Amino acid sequence: MRLLLTNDDGVNSKGIYTLAKELQKEHEIIIAAPSIEMSAKSHSITIAKPLFIKEVELDDINATTYSISGTPADCVKVAMDKILDKPVDMVISGINYGTNLGIDILYSGTVSAAIEAAIHNIPSIAMSAEVKNGDINFDTAASIARELVKISQENSMKGNLVLNVNVPCLDKDSLKGLKVCQMGGRTFTSYFEKIEKNKEVSYMLKGELTNNHKPTTDIHFLRKGYTTITPLHYDLTNFKIMNDVSNWF
């Protein structure tokens, strides 16, 4: 298969490097990723300034690689329009440093890059790896990504489908398996810390994660040692309440 790789941690991150090294064993890959870290950029795009595209090299990676001065969504958009000389079969975003569970999905540049691919009718997978006590296992996540690409190909994955995948911080042999599940109820209780320095006042976002989830969710199963897979789409319409809202007017 012909795959486009992207991420939000930047073109020089270990996550995308490990992913590329694993997937190039069986696939043709092209990399288009942000020149710097673009975490939590969600689906933002650049509209008021030009994007700069620079071809770079990654050691031991057999792929044409582009460093782009934009967001993860920018990278996919500009790759589709200006970089790719022929279509790709799938877009893989990641491997993200840290999970994208529950409401994280809405803030995630990793997931949004995958959703941008779906907007272009290209199937995509967003890969994220758990960080636990400062440790992360990119090798496990990359191996899982390779398996999922094969499974997706065998099942003719649709172009408007995104798989949000989160891999526990475990060796592959210790994983309990794959679990398809829904988003969990995860919120970020935020507050801003006031900082006064050099006669200037600034505010730094702080806070804690609060998990309010059912035993059918990505958060629950990841904690149990499963790789979680949540199918996503970009239509945010709340169909359950549409008729009720129609009756308001």
Curated annotation (Swiss-Prot):
Gene3D superfamilies registered for this protein in UniProt: Survival protein SurE-like phosphatase/nucleotidase
Binding site for a divalent metal cation: 8-9, 39, 96
Cofactor note: Binds 1 divalent metal cation per subunit.
MF-aspect GO terms: 3'-nucleotidase activity; 5'-nucleotidase activity; exopolyphosphatase activity; metal ion binding; nucleotide binding
Entry superkingdom: Bacteria
Signal peptide: none
GO cellular component, one term: cytoplasm
Pfam families: SurE
E.C. no: 3.1.3.5
Record's catalysed reaction(s): a ribonucleoside 5'-phosphate + H2O = a ribonucleoside + phosphate
Needed cofactors: a divalent metal cation
Keywords: Cytoplasm, Hydrolase, Metal-binding, Nucleotide-binding
Keyword Transcription listed: no
Location of the protein in the cell: Cytoplasm
Matching SUPFAM superfamilies: SurE-like
HAMAP family per record: SurE
NCBIfam families according to UniProt: PRK13933.1 (NF010543), surE (TIGR00087)
Role played: Nucleotidase that shows phosphatase activity on nucleoside 5'-monophosphates.
Family: Belongs to the SurE nucleotidase family.
Name of this chain's protein: 5'-nucleotidase SurE
Annotated gene: surE
